[in-house]
């Protein structure tokens, strides 16, 4: 939960506005790509094609917990599966919406 609050605070400070779902997805995406790149052990001497192949393979081998969801995995076709995190704003306060 702390990561969500920090993201919102940092976003508001940097952009003078409230982040939307696309901002949260983009934020998570950067860190997912970072994790896949580390898993793939990318090196500067690799060709772009080899990097792409290694990243694609690594994406099917990682399982991540990020701000927008938990236990996120990807199929060989690139389709994600996750337990989504839903955040609502009530009275200016961010709250995680839990399933009942």
Give, region by region, the residue ranges found by the protein language model:
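Extracytosolic ligand-binding ectodomains
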Residues: 1-100
């Amino acid at each position: 939960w702390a990561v969500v609050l920090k993201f919102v605070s940092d976003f508001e400070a940097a952009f003078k506005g409230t982040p939307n779902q696309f901002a949260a997805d983009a934020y998570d995406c950067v860190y997912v790509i970072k994790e896949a790149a580390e898993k793939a052990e990318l090196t500067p001497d690799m060709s772009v094609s080899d990097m792409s192949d290694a990243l694609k393979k690594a994406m099917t081998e990682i399982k991540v917990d990020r701000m927008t969801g938990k236990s996120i995995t990807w199929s060989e076709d690139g389709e994600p599966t996750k337990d989504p995190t839903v955040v609502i704003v009530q009275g200016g306060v961010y709250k995680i919406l839990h399933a009942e």
